[in-house]
A protein has these predicted regions:
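Phosphate/nucleotide-binding beta-alpha loop and adjacent structural elements of enzyme active sites
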Residues: 1-120
Length: 120
């Protein structure tokens, strides 16, 4: 993966993104990270600027085994608004789904997935 870093200390505006230094970083999936570190999440929140679907795909085994509550942003693309709920509904058994919308515009729509064993 490639990660960009921006130094705003010299009042560089975001338009200077072409000048950002590019560095290589190691990345992993949620499944590998949780397994390697013996982590059993009970709540997962994702607002990762359109990377929610690949993150969910890389964490589905953990989500299925640990059954955490989820709060997943789905507003970054029209496809996410449709595909993320369909993907979760297909892959998660006995979950309730709810939408939360926190803006008068298209942004800030969150899909909540709550295991049925959790009463709300």
């Amino acid at each position: 993966s490639v990660c960009s870093y921006c130094d705003f200390s010299n009042n560089n505006p975001p338009a200077d993104m072409a000048k950002w230094e590019k560095i290589q970083i190691n990345a992993t999936t949620m499944d590998k990270f949780c397994c390697n570190n013996n982590i059993m999440p009970d709540f997962i929140k994702m607002d990762i600027e359109g990377a929610e679907m690949p993150a969910l795909e890389g964490g589905m085994k953990t989500i299925q085994e640990c059954r955490p509550q989820l709060a997943i942003s789905i507003y970054h693309s029209n496809e996410d608004f449709i595909n993320i709920p369909l993907y979760l509904n297909k892959n998660l058994k006995n979950y309730h789904f709810k939408l939360g919308h926190y803006s008068p515009w298209r942004s800030e729509t969150v899909l909540y997935a709550i295991p049925q064993e959790i009463k709300f």
